[in-house]
A protein has these predicted regions:
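Non-catalytic cap/lid and distal C-terminal segments of serine-dependent acyl enzymes
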Residues: 1-191
C-alpha cells in the first residue's frame, strides 16, 4: 500500500492441510509484513493436495508453479524473478517440493514443522487424503522418487537457493524432519 516500487518480490505462503488460504490472515499479521517489507504475499488454497498434481484430484503443482505466478504477474506488479516460498506442515512439504522441482524459480524456500513425508507412518484416518494426493497410503514406498524431498535435495541443480527447515521435538513430523535436516546438512545447500 505504502510502497511505490515498479515491481515487488513475491512470497508464496502455503498453509497446512485442512486450512485454507485465509489461515495466514486469521493467525498472523501477514498484511502488515507485506506492507513493511514491500512484497506481494500470495496465499493459495491447496486443499489436501500437498501441493501436488493429485493422483485423484486436481493439478495443484501446475497451478502453484505455473498458472498462479502467470496470473499474479498479469494482475499485480510482481517481480517473478524474485520469488520465495514457505509453508507449515503439509504446506512446508509443498513449498520444498515446488522449490526443488522447479530449479531457478525461487530464491528461498522454507518449511516449518514438516520433513520428508516419505519417512513417516500415518494414521489410517489419513488414508484417503494420502491416496488422493500421492496414489498410495504408505508414503515410504515413495522413497527415491520425485515425491521424496531427500532425493530432490540430493539431485538438486539449483544450489544458489536458500533453504530453511525449522522444526521442534513437539512437531508431528519430527522424525522425518530430522532425517531431512541431516540430508540438507550433507548437501551443498548447507555450504
Amino acid at each position: 500500500e505504502n510502497n511505490e516500487k515498479s515491481s515487488y518480490p513475491v512470497l508464496w505462503l502455503l498453509p497446512p492441510a485442512g486450512c485454507d488460504h485465509t489461515a495466514w490472515q486469521r493467525h498472523t499479521a501477514v498484511e502488515d509484513l507485506a506492507d513493511e517489507l514491500g512484497i506481494i504475499i500470495v496465499m493459495p488454497d491447496l486443499k489436501l493436495s500437498y501441493g501436488l498434481d493429485m493422483i485423484h484430484g486436481f493439478t495443484y503443482f501446475q497451478m502453484l508453479t505455473k498458472e498462479l505466478p502467470e496470473m499474479v504477474a498479469d494482475y499485480f506488479p510482481a517481480d517473478l524473478g524474485f520469488q520465495m516460498i514457505a509453508g507449515v506442515k503439509e504446506g512446508g512439504y509443498a513449498a520444498l517440493n515446488a522449490a526443488l522441482s522447479v530449479p531457478g524459480q525461487y530464491h528461498m524456500a522454507a518449511s516449518y514443522s514438516c520433513g520428508s513425508l516419505t519417512d513417516e507412518t500415518f494414521d489410517p484416518e489419513m488414508d484417503k487424503q494420502l491416496d488422493n494426493a500421492f496414489g498410495t497410503t504408505d508414503l515410504r514406498t515413495l522413497n527415491g522418487t520425485d515425491k521424496d524431498l531427500k532425493m530432490l535435495i540430493q539431485t538438486a541443480k539449483d544450489h544458489n537457493m536458500a533453504l530453511s527447515l525449522e522444526y521442534s521435538e513437539k512437531d508431528d513430523y519430527k522424525a522425518s524432519s530430522a532425517l531431512l535436516a541431516d540430508c540438507i546438512l550433507k548437501s551443498s545447500f548447507s555450504s
